[in-house]
Design a protein with these regions (language model features):
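Ribonuclease/tRNase effector modules and their secretory precursors
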Residues: 1-85
C-alpha cells in the first residue's frame, strides 16, 4: 500500500486497506491492466481500491471509503453489468 493512500485518506489505515484487499468481494480488470476491487475492512466498511499486480507483488495505489457510484458503475460495466454491492 503506497503511503500516499493514507496521506490522502487519513480515515483509512494500512491495516484497513490490507484487510479490505484480503476480503475482496468484487473486482474487475481495466484495459490498462490495473485492477479495481471492493473489499471489506476490519471495521465493516466497503473500501474501493485500485492496484496493479506484477508477479507476486501487488501495489495498491488508491483506496477510498465508501466506494463511489462512479467506481461501482465502472466495475459493473467491466464485469458485464452484473450488479455490485
Amino acid at each position: 500500500v503506497l503511503d500516499r493512500v493514507m496521506e490522502r485518506h487519513p480515515e483509512l489505515s494500512e491495516k484497513d486497506v490490507v484487510t479490505a484487499f484480503r476480503s475482496v468481494m468484487v473486482d474487475a480488470e481495466r484495459e490498462s491492466g490495473a485492477w479495481m476491487a471492493i473489499g471489506l475492512d476490519g471495521r465493516g466498511r466497503n473500501v474501493e481500491m485500485l492496484y496493479r499486480a506484477v508477479g507476486d507483488l501487488v501495489v495498491i495505489y488508491h483506496a477510498f471509503t465508501p466506494p463511489t457510484k462512479k467506481f461501482r458503475r465502472e466495475i459493473d460495466r467491466l464485469r458485464g453489468d452484473r450488479r455490485t454491492l
